A protein has these predicted regions:
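Structural motif
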Residues: 54-56
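Short Pro-Cys-Gly-centered "Cys-loop" motif that presents a nucleophilic cysteine in a tight turn
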Residues: 1-47, 51, 61-215
């Protein structure tokens, strides 16, 4: 996985053999605490959804990385966007440490997640070297909706706000979560903070939010 600064990615993985990865309420919270520790220094989280056997994150890689990140070689081509290799390692650390905790809890051994975490780079980017004419707004919006629709599409809830393990409740003003950079998401997705809930369903009704470009 290569992650480039200021680009937006859909990151997702599921349980090995589609098995459960979250067994109780505390597991979900523990995983999010791990995400905050391992990933948040390197990326802005725009949306997330944790499902019983898989997870989704919509993120934008930060332009300025922590000083602890080893600098890349100084020689580079003009306009070249350099990847941030530490992020893939941090995702590995997140999943490995979570697996160890769950294996201990469930008295099990072996892998919990599928071997390869997928990271789909969307066409939208605020980076100045992004291809001209590719705003990717529809893909970002599609992914935002796709992630929040997971509990509905799998029959767990009838409304997105009923699933407490996603960021939708934060955007809908039903919870004061701080994991997502909501202001950045409003800017990228052209949402208005005060009327998010109404705008969400207007946009949802107007488009197809399972576009293959975001998954």
């Amino acid at each position: 996985m290569n992650f480039e600064p200021e680009y937006i990615y859909h990151i997702y993985n599921r349980g090995n053999n589609r098995q459960k990865i979250f067994f109780n309420h505390e597991n979900y919270l523990f995983f999010l605490r791990k995400v905050r520790k391992e990933l948040l220094p390197y990326m802005d989280i725009l949306a997330y959804c944790l499902m019983p056997n898989h997870f989704h994150f919509l993120v934008q890689i930060k332009a300025k990385q922590p000083q602890s990140v080893r600098p890349l070689p100084a020689v580079r081509r003009i306009g070249e966007v350099r990847p941030v290799p530490v992020i893939a390692r941090k995702i590995g650390t997140l999943l490995s440490s979570y697996t160890q905790a769950i294996n201990k809890q469930q008295h099990r051994t072996g892998s919990l997640f599928q071997q390869k975490t997928k990271a789909k780079r969307l066409t939208h980017s605020t980076h100045p070297t992004a291809p001209s004419g590719q705003t990717g707004f529809d893909y970002d919006l599609a992914c935002f909706h796709y992630i929040h629709r997971n509990p509905i599409d799998t029959g767990l809830t009838k409304k997105p706000e009923e699933w407490v393990y996603s960021s939708f409740r934060d955007y809908a003003g039903l919870r004061k979560g701080s994991l997502c950079n909501k202001e950045l998401a409003y800017e990228i997705l052209h949402y208005d903070k005060e009327s998010f809930y109404e705008q969400y369903f207007v946009k949802f009704s107007a488009g197809n939010f399972t576009h293959p470009q975001c998954i």
